[in-house]
Amino acid sequence: MYLIRGLKNLSLFNERFSEEQLVVTIGNFDGLHQGHKKIIQEMKNISQNSSAKTMVIFTEPHAKEFFSMDKNIMDQPARISPWRDKFKNLENENIDFAFFLKFNKSLQTMSPEIFIEKVLGPLNISNLMIGDDFRFGQDRKGDFLMLKDWSKSQGISLSKLPTFSIDNRRVSSTWIRETLSLSDFSTTKKLLGRPYSFEGKVVHGNRLGRSIGFPTANIWLPKNNLPIKGVFSVKISIDVSEFEGIANIGIRPTVGGTSPVLEVNIFDFKKEIYGKRIKVEFVKKIRDEKKFDSLDDLKKQIAKDVNTAKEQLLDEKN
């Protein structure tokens, strides 16, 4: 998948791919859920029956996150997928081109007319596909009717896809965040079309877990508010190998932490994996994070958590 990083690189893309006709969709794509995949599949169907290539135009960060940048991270809207995971999920859908637009003051104040002129106008679009709730431009003033008029003038086929529903409810990022806040990972999986997971690089920590008998892989997290917090039973993917373990996402109040971290104790695993990217799939919640009076109390609780996690993981197999 070819990535276009911002409007400033659009001219370079056109120099290289100006002859390519494009089937295009636009959105934020946080989580890349089943509703998003329905649109992408429709794009691919058109692409397979023509010579056109597929392109997803997406914004980062989410608008709600942008408008709360002055708040503490923990008070900002929760993000389903970090930037890297979003990109990888799009790549897994075999999209030809991804056009990344940074949601900043310039984009936020851009009128719908200028958005069409600067973002869509330079592209050789044959088909434009949007969801039924898509809005664009300053104050979300741009809508389907505006795109319809422009598309007609350019000879572009415009499609508005109907709502994609599961159990008579519209699939949305809001619903997914709701399931994650409840640790309802089975419903999350149904809405995403895949298990919920994080992927990140293992970095050096303070080795506290090792000192109390439970060594952890500390995974770097972007500075975003995460939709889940607490202690969980998890599955871990390292290269082509699969493992089981227990994970904590939180600020580690017992040792005076203030920023969110992801720590994973991998069962029956002793290799050094610093610098490796690993994937952590969340199976079931064990408990909320809490502050303990002593490290000894923390150690005893982790031992209980490990037993609970092993039971949960065994139940999940049956």
Model segments located where?
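Surface-exposed amphipathic alpha-helices with a cationic face
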Residues: 40-48, 148, 152
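Residue-level signal for inorganic ion chemistry
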Residues: 33, 90, 128, 188, ...
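N-terminal Rossmann-like or analogous alpha/beta NTP/dinucleotide-binding catalytic cores
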Residues: 65-132, 136-154
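Di-metal (Zn2+ and/or Mg2+/Mn2+) metal-binding site signature of metallo-dependent hydrolases
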Residues: 25-43
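Glycine-rich, Lys/Arg-enriched anion-binding loops that position phosphate/diphosphate groups
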Residues: 151-250
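ATP-dependent adenylation/pyrophosphate-handling site
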Residues: 19, 23-26, 43-70
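Positively charged, low-complexity intrinsically disordered leader regions
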Residues: 1-25
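Phosphate/ribose-recognition catalytic cores of enzymes acting on nucleotide-derived substrates
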Residues: 205-318
